[in-house]
Amino acid sequence: MKILLIGYGAMNQRVARLAEEKGHEIVGVIENTPKATTPYQQYQHIADVKDADVAIDFSNPNLLFPLLDEEFHLPLVVATTGEKEKLLNKLDELSQNMPVFFSANMSYGVHALTKILAAAVPLLDDFDIELTEAHHNKKVDAPSGTLEKLYDVIVSLKENVTPVYDRHELNEKRQPQDIGIHSIRGGTIVGEHEVLFAGTDETIQITHRAQSKDIFANGAIQAAERLVNKPNGFYTFDNL
């Protein structure tokens, strides 16, 4: 499989290493600013890369969105987070002409976490729910795209829920419809996501901890391996 990388930060550097270990080939890189240290052919436009089988994106909206407005037809794996609604609308449009895969978290374990959460919410309907995510001190966006995905699962199963990001200015008791959303930034934490169900005299916690960023890179590669054989359409872990 011949792979074009969109972005060449820490994550796509891992994708390159792991993909080559699997026998795949990196045919080029698209970056905001070309760098002399990048060990692959650098391009400005997706359509300029004639021999790629798939593109894997671990970048940012500033790099990705202009590329998505260009004319190209290439299977696309997208892991960029930020401006999610705008991104999903654009990817849905592109999926009419090419296979597109999107996940805010490329770990299959996190996908399993969403399924566990979907099963737990109806069973624990009278429990309070708090969501917490923790990441390294260089992560810019908060809350994480994964935590937003977990919140979306809850919204799909409970009525009239309210996200609460900060209780500092709230001078009232917790309301039943509140869903607490908390972000922690520090050190080199790869990624942790926890769902707390708090009931009367008991709590249940469901936690996913990433121990290496390799799980995200491998998840993107595995998605690409499947996507190249798919017809045009929008794909997630649910239908890939």
UniProtKB/Swiss-Prot annotation:
InterPro entries: DapB_C, DapB_N, DapB_N_CS, DHDPR_bac, NAD(P)-bd_dom_sf
Gene3D superfamilies according to UniProt: Dihydrodipicolinate Reductase, domain 2 (3.30.360.10), NAD(P)-binding Rossmann-like Domain (3.40.50.720)
Highest taxon, organism lineage: Bacteria
Catalytic activity: (S)-2,3,4,5-tetrahydrodipicolinate + NAD(+) + H2O = (2S,4S)-4-hydroxy-2,3,4,5-tetrahydrodipicolinate + NADH + H(+); (S)-2,3,4,5-tetrahydrodipicolinate + NADP(+) + H2O = (2S,4S)-4-hydroxy-2,3,4,5-tetrahydrodipicolinate + NADPH + H(+)
Keyword tags: Amino-acid biosynthesis, Cytoplasm, Diaminopimelate biosynthesis, Lysine biosynthesis, NAD, NADP, Oxidoreductase
EC class (word): oxidoreductase
SUPFAM superfamilies: Glyceraldehyde-3-phosphate dehydrogenase-like, C-terminal domain, NAD(P)-binding Rossmann-fold domains
Protein name: 4-hydroxy-tetrahydrodipicolinate reductase
Originating organism: Staphylococcus aureus (strain Mu3 / ATCC 700698)
